[in-house]
UniProtKB/Swiss-Prot annotation:
Its EC number is 2.7.7.6. This is DNA-directed RNA polymerase subunit beta''. GO terms for cellular component: chloroplast; DNA-directed RNA polymerase complex; mitochondrion. DNA-dependent RNA polymerase catalyzes the transcription of DNA into RNA using the four ribonucleoside triphosphates as substrates. It is found in: Plastid, Chloroplast. GO terms for molecular function: DNA binding; DNA-directed RNA polymerase activity; zinc ion binding. It catalyses: RNA(n) + a ribonucleoside 5'-triphosphate = RNA(n+1) + diphosphate. The gene is rpoC2. Transmembrane segments: none annotated. It comes from Pinus thunbergii. The lineage of its organism: Eukaryota, Viridiplantae, Streptophyta, Embryophyta, Tracheophyta. One of its GO terms (biological process) is DNA-templated transcription. Its cofactor is Zn(2+).
Length: 1224
């Protein structure tokens, strides 16, 4: 309706009143509705039509004279848009970082993004009206947008504000918003996203219009026979309606409650302080509705079509006033068809609108509480529980009313937080004015639907579960594990290789392998051969000599074969053994099958001759190659050659000590001297090395391999008393310069052309054991140098070391040189020379966490240090500062005060650390990872990626499983608010009308029945508790269904009378299903009959009829009516007619549709002459029904002669009859 500026002039010759005021105001659509209603009340329908004709003529004339046009210069953008978009982008960047750190998962990030940009778009839309009002009040865009005719504020907002969030073809909101408006122009990406919404609007306009028309047809079909036939059905039942719902300042809610009351009929007298202000069967007008709202706060009992006793009809008082005029509905009115058209018609019209956002955002359902002024907030921490908000922020949840106090400088204010609210601040926290401190849960839950979202791995590597991720025991053997508690899942970086990529059939744990990326042409000349040499003397197994020929890869330009010798300790004994000299040829052992025919093939490597069978099939454990290099041990020497020739001098004696450790199963918890359950890092046998005899030039050894019965999970923890320096060396080899080696002998064959051999470290990696112990299909994990990074703990060494360390060399060593990272390479005690390291006790430390609970409790060891002067120093885990327990300075031999302030982090082997955590004094951790080695001054960290998994999510892999990039990692299950616009709302109205199994009504029926059964059984006993609870549950479901349908329409400003929807819902719940428990042969089990018919037959028969109430959809209800002609004209004509002929059904032609089909007179129409008397049904309206309470009790308890839902014993029936006679 356009804006009309009109004048109602005083016309004494035409208007009957002389005191008509002069009215000069801009009239919008709502004001014109009120004007027409007042004109009808004062002048009647005929005179009002003449006034409206004059108003229409004046409007068209004024619109022609005005001639409003729209130009591009009229599109003015609000000046505040720039900083609003910039602020939203900054918030989105913070949300992206939190997701990268693992603090929030993908669903929470999407929610945050949607809320941020929706709030920005809405604020910009609200700024649009004041901007026009101040700069250009007569702007044509401004005038058109507020006219109510064409072009709403949301559409103008796309022209001068920002387009905002769009939806994809599936209706899901895209988290990338369109920041520009149509005046500024769209970028290519924004245009493509905008096309989604445009195409969706075109398709919806065509498809949804047809759906809305079909919905209207079904709605009319199910209620076409309902006509007002009686004045009063005599029922005393009804429903309670609250006049005010919510806070009184919410004017929109008051208007909604007023519209519900207007036109209804009271089912009981209304008293205020013992004074009757309204009587039963009195219709409620505007004056009485306002009086009830102003005077009452408790619910009002009104009549409704739900409880009308008329069979297949409806009475005048249960329906109430007509929606066309302010009088009771006339007899003969076809209210069923009116109800169907009233619900279906708005859907048909509103589908012509284009809603590109995919739904009205429902984030404003929760009510926010803000601080009134600056101050410190205080509350009882024992009454709140830590939780997470739906956006992933930490918060507190209060189950009961929580009293909080805000203490400002000049004032103190107490606030009460309602139950089930979220508190977003901590105790004793300083809050600023208007800061959000609590979020109150909405009283009525919005439409929600459960959605599954898959999270895919962004990293190739190995899966690890945090100790905070628990799994149900019944799913241990399955591949899908449900998560019982919120926690982290980690993907530890590592490459996956197998026989199909790089052929390594003889790989071992901690072996170094040569891995090249895929090339254009990749062929395999030979596999890797492991030279397993055993030098035996007596019964002792001394050491192992390994020789590996690395993988051969061929490209079109060059070929490379590298051969590598490596020495490693294989088996250890606590004592030393002398080894006698013995020579033995090295041999290659292969575990394959072959025949006995051989051929010689010379590999261009100077040390080996291979024998390969002609058929190419090798035999298991057969010797097919010999090495030309002999390895020998001199007679009588003590292990002089278990090391490489690169040693500066050979050691004479080596003493090996065995340290003890605890082995346990994965996930097992062990009690260690405390009541605290401590999860341990998986360890295996560790070795303490000690060089006894000093030599002129020191020689060091590195542990390369450890033999265990089974490859273990997690970490191998090893402590070395003396730290061996690793180094980079250069070998004089023209074909392979700059080869890095350590305790190894490297050979590169001469096939490399033009010096194209590459550094070993570039494609070399360490084979890592699988945590789950699986060794199937020959696949294994290789950790390349790119999977590691190193972080230096302290740059300034003078704070913790002596002066002789000033010339210490700390090169950035290649991780690949370590020949396998096996654990702690250095103890922390070496940081404090001549001091003793003591672990005193375990303590619990509270630290802010980002998953599940906002405060997570974990274990931190409490350390004490004792130096050579026997002075004990305490390490405070809360401050990370070492302090002297007895004196001001912990280092008594030095006077520098800086020693007291030196800090170091508490880290442990195998610890998983997220990104941005400060463990170094210089900078935070650059990326997430797992600590795999602890050095004297640095940490070696394996790259990892954390993923946050919430409760009820499912993990699609086992612990320790190797995953490729892009594999499905987690499936998150979350609740999403259903969009409430009319395009997305029409399917929801159809879903509710058809009573689908997945709607909220069906889900709440069972829970509501159980709740009411418990309450009623407690008050009335089991005899009537079950019966009344079943009846109340059905009534509550009817009301809930009406409210849900109304919510969809009201979200778009469409007002539909509740009585129209109640007529539809009444037909959906009017049928019952005969059960098989009864013994009466009147109805067949499984037959659908009308409830009133079942009640009548139940009263007439000796035996009870057992049935259960049903919630039928409108389609099914239309196919189960009393008229088979109406059913056959709707759907399934052949089946309906054949079934009716076989059953011998008779159609009594009581509805409108069947009479129209047969050409008869329809049983509807107004204008009947009825004699009205002062009494209605024999009851004086001035006195009322004095036996109203007695009739209510009868109607509740003895509406049936026998209780139909449940069978009771004979004494129960006897008690039932005695009580009935007393009431009579």
């Amino acid at each position: 309706m356009k804006i009309w500026r009109f004048f109602l002039m005083k016309e004494r010759t035409r208007l009957p009143f002389d005191n008509l005021p002069f009215y000069n105001k801009v009239m919008d659509k709502t004001a014109i509705k009120k004007l027409i209603s007042r004109l009808i009340d004062h002048f009647g329908m005929t005179y009002t039509s003449h006034i409206l004709d004059q108003l229409k003529t004046s409007g068209f004339q004024q619109a022609t004279d005005t001639a409003i046009s729209l130009g591009i210069d009229d599109l003015l953008t609000a000046p505040s848009k720039g900083w609003l978009v910039q602020d939203a982008e900054q918030q989105g960047s913070v949300s992206e970082k939190q997701n990268h750190y693992g603090n929030v998962h993908a669903v929470e990030k999407l929610r945050q993004s949607i809320e941020i940009w929706y709030a920005t778009s809405e604020y910009l839309r609200k700024e649009m009206n004041p901007n026009f009002s101040m700069t250009d009040p007569l702007n044509p865009v401004h005038v058109m947008s507020f006219s109510g005719a064409r072009g709403s504020t949301s559409q103008v907002h796309q022209l001068v504000g920002m387009r905002g969030l769009m939806s994809d073809p599936q209706g899901q909101i895209i988290d990338l918003p369109i920041r520009r408006n149509l005046r500024e122009g769209l970028s290519l990406t924004e245009y493509i996203i905008s096309c989604y919404g445009a195409r969706k609007g075109v398709v919806d306009t065509a498809v949804r219009t047809a759906d809305a028309g079909y919905l209207t047809r079904r709605l009319v079909e199910v209620v076409q026979h309902i006509v007002v036939r009686r004045t009063d059905c005599g029922t005393i039942q009804g429903i309670f309606v609250s006049p005010i719902r919510g806070r009184e300042r919410d004017r929109n809610e008051i208007v909604v409650r007023t519209q519900i009351l207007i036109g209804r009929v009271l089912a009981d007298d209304v008293y205020i302080n013992r004074r009757c202000i309204a009587t039963r069967n009195q219709d409620i007008g505007v004056g009485l509705a306002n009086q009830l709202i102003n005077l009452r706060t408790q619910p009002i009992y009104i009549r409704t079509p739900f409880t009308c006793k008329s069979i297949s009809r409806i009475c005048q008082l249960c329906y109430g006033r007509s929606t066309t005029h302010s009088h009771l509905i006339e007899l003969g009115e076809a209210v069923g068809i009116i109800a169907g058209q009233s619900i279906g018609e708005p859907g048909t019209q509103l589908t012509l609108r284009t809603f590109h956002t995919g739904g009205v955002f429902t984030g404003d359902i929760a009510e926010h509480i803000r601080a009134p002024f600056n101050g410190k907030i205080e509350f009882n921490e024992n009454l709140v529980y830590p939780t997470r908000t739906r956006n992933g922020h930490p918060a507190y949840l209060c189950h009961n009313n929580l009293s909080i106090t805000i203490d400002g400088q000049d004032q103190v204010q107490n606030l009460t937080i309602p139950p089930q609210s979220l508190l977003l601040v901590q105790n004793d926290q300083y809050v600023e004015s208007e800061q959000l401190i609590a979020e109150v849960r909405a009283r009525t839950s919005s439409f929600k639907e459960k959605v599954r979202k898959n999270i895919y791995s962004d990293l190739e590597g190995e899966m690890h579960w945090s100790t905070n991720v628990c799994h149900a025991p019944e799913y241990v053997q399955g591949n899908v594990h449900p998560i019982l508690r919120t926690g982290y899942l980690w993907i530890l970086s590592g490459g996956i290789y197998g026989s199909r990529v790089v052929p390594f059939p003889f790989h071992k744990y901690q072996d170094q392998v040569y891995v090249q990326p895929f090339v254009a042409k990749h062929q395999s000349l030979s596999d890797s051969y492991v030279d397993q040499v055993e030098h035996r003397s007596g019964d002792s197994n001394c050491y192992e000599k390994e020789e590996q020929i690395f993988s051969y890869s061929e490209t079109e330009t060059d070929r490379t074969i590298s051969n590598k010798h490596r020495d490693s300790i294989y088996v250890f004994y606590p004592n030393n053994y002398n080894i006698k000299g013995k020579k033995q040829m090295n041999r290659f052992i292969v575990s394959l099958q072959c025949d006995k025919e051989w051929e010689k093939k010379i590999i261009p490597c100077p040390d080996a001759i291979l024998r390969i069978p002609k058929s190419g099939i090798l035999q298991r454990n057969s010797i097919f190659g010999y090495s030309n290099v002999e390895h020998g041990i001199p007679d009588g020497s003590n292990m002089t050659t278990p090391f490489s020739l690169d040693l500066s001098r050979e050691g004479d004696n080596l003493q090996i000590q065995i340290s003890y450790s605890i082995s346990y199963e994965d996930g097992e918890r062990i009690q260690v001297m405390s009541d605290i359950s401590i999860p341990l890092v998986r360890t295996c046998i560790g070795f303490d090395w000690e060089q006894i005899d000093s030599i002129e030039s020191e020689a060091y050894v590195s542990l390369i391999s450890v033999r265990t019965n089974k490859i273990v999970n997690n970490m191998v923890q090893i402590s070395l008393m003396k730290y061996p320096p690793f180094f980079m060396g250069r070998r004089d080899n023209k074909t392979s310069p700059n080869l890095m080696f350590h305790n190894n002998l490297d050979h590169t064959n001469l096939l490399s052309s033009n010096g194209a051999s590459q550094l070993i470290s570039k494609h070399q990696g360490i084979i890592c054991s699988l945590s789950n112990g699986e060794e199937d299909s020959g696949s294994f994990m290789v950790l390349s140098p790119s999977d590691y990074f190193r972080i230096v703990l302290f740059n300034d060494s003078k704070c913790y070391d002596t002066g002789n360390q000033s010339n210490r060399k700390d090169p950035m060593r290649k991780i690949i040189e370590f020949s396998g990272l096996l654990g702690n390479l250095h103890s922390i005690t070496n940081r404090f020379p001549s001091s003793h390291f003591l672990t005193y006790k375990k303590v619990l430390s509270k630290k802010h966490s980002i998953f599940h609970n906002s405060f997570n409790t974990f274990q931190v060891p409490k350390y004490y240090f004792m130096d050579e002067n026997m002075i004990i120093y305490h390490f405070d885990p809360c401050r990370n500062i070492i302090s002297n327990l007895l004196g001001p300075n912990w280092c008594s031999s030095s006077s520098e005060s800086e020693f007291c302030e030196k800090t170091f982090p508490v880290v442990s082997l195998g610890q998983l650390i997220p990104e941005s955590v400060w463990i170094s004094e210089d900078e935070p951790l650059p990326e997430s990872g797992q600590i795999i080695a602890v050095d004297e001054e640095s940490l070696v960290i394996r790259s990892a990626k954390p993923y946050l998994a919430t409760r009820k999510a499912t993990v699609h892999s086992h612990y320790g499983k190797i995953l490729d990039k892009g594999d499905t990692l987690i499936t998150l299950i979350y609740e999403r608010f259903k969009s409430s616009d009319i395009i997305q709302g029409l399917p929801k109205v159809e879903q509710l009308s058809e009573a689908r199994l997945n709607n909220s009504i069906s889900m709440n029926l069972k829970e509501s029945f159980e709740n009411w059964t418990g309450d009623m059984t407690r008050f009335l006993g089991s005899l009537w508790g079950l019966f009344i609870s079943a009846r109340i549950t059905m009534e509550q479901s009817q009301i809930h269904l009406v409210n849900q349908i109304q919510k969809v329409y009201r979200s778009q400003g469409v007002r539909i009378g509740d009585k129209h929807i109640e007529v539809i819902v009444r037909q959906m719940t009017s049928k019952v299903l005969i059960s098989e428990d009864g013994t009466a042969n009147v109805f067949s089990p499984g037959e659908l009959i009308v409830l009133s018919r079942a009640q009548r037959m139940d009263r007439a028969l000796e035996e009870a009829i057992y049935y259960q109430t049903m919630l039928l959809g409108i389609t099914r209800a239309s196919l189960n009516t009393q008229s088979f002609i109406s059913e056959a004209s709707f759907q399934e004509t052949a089946r309906v007619l054949a079934k009716a002929a076989l059953q011998g059904r008779i159609d009594w032609l009581k509805g409108l549709k069947e009479n129209v089909i047969l050409g008869g007179m329809i049983p509807a129409g107004t204008g009947q002459h009825i004699h009205r008397s002062g009494k209605r049904n024999g009851i004086d309206p001035r006195i009322g029904n004095r036996n109203l309470f007695s009739n209510k009790v009868k109607d509740i308890l003895f509406h049936h002669d026998k209780v139909d839902f449940f069978s009771f014993q004979d004494n129960s029936y006897k008690y039932h009859n005695i009580l009935k006679q007393q009431l009579k």
